[in-house]
């Protein structure tokens, strides 16, 4: 049997056992109050290891809907020949201006282990402030239909002071 485990910071936990010769279709993973949960993890967890991933997959799936993950929506680990069909990723929109920092800043997309190929599209940011971040806004992957408006930032203690 294969176990599918959902666990969100000790508030939600579910385990599903699936016979090894059966396929799993139609999983929906959603967080009940996405803004509250996302903001909690964004403000209180400084490293990525403390934020939950909506679902981690170690075998093939189809017809997945993933909603409002505080970190990654989908992670593939220790897989060969993974095939994903009919995936939908839904997310909420933060209505208020975003303040980010201190830290790395905001990264759109991730190259992943071994610089695997990744593409990101349809990201629109309007109104963000970056305080004491190393990078501000950045992307390490191919992006399409991405806009940043009204984004600004400053350092209270510059990381790389000007040369004298």
Curated annotation (Swiss-Prot):
Enzyme Commission code: 3.2.1.15
Catalyzed chemical reaction(s): (1,4-alpha-D-galacturonosyl)n+m + H2O = (1,4-alpha-D-galacturonosyl)n + (1,4-alpha-D-galacturonosyl)m
InterPro entries: Glyco_hydro_28, Pectin_lyas_fold, Pectin_lyase_fold/virulence
Pfam families cross-referenced by the UniProt entry: Glyco_hydro_28
Hydrolase among keywords: yes
Molecular functions per Gene Ontology: polygalacturonase activity
One of the protein's GO biological processes: cell wall organization
Location, primary (coarse class): secreted
Highest taxon in the source lineage: Eukaryota
Protein's cellular compartments: Secreted, Cell wall
One GO CC term, this protein: extracellular region
Keyword Repeat recorded: no
Record key words, sorted: Allergen, Cell wall, Cell wall biogenesis/degradation, Glycosidase, Hydrolase, Secreted
PANTHER family on file: PTHR31375
Family statement: Belongs to the glycosyl hydrolase 28 family.
Stated name of the protein: Polygalacturonase
Species for this entry: Cupressus sempervirens (Italian cypress)
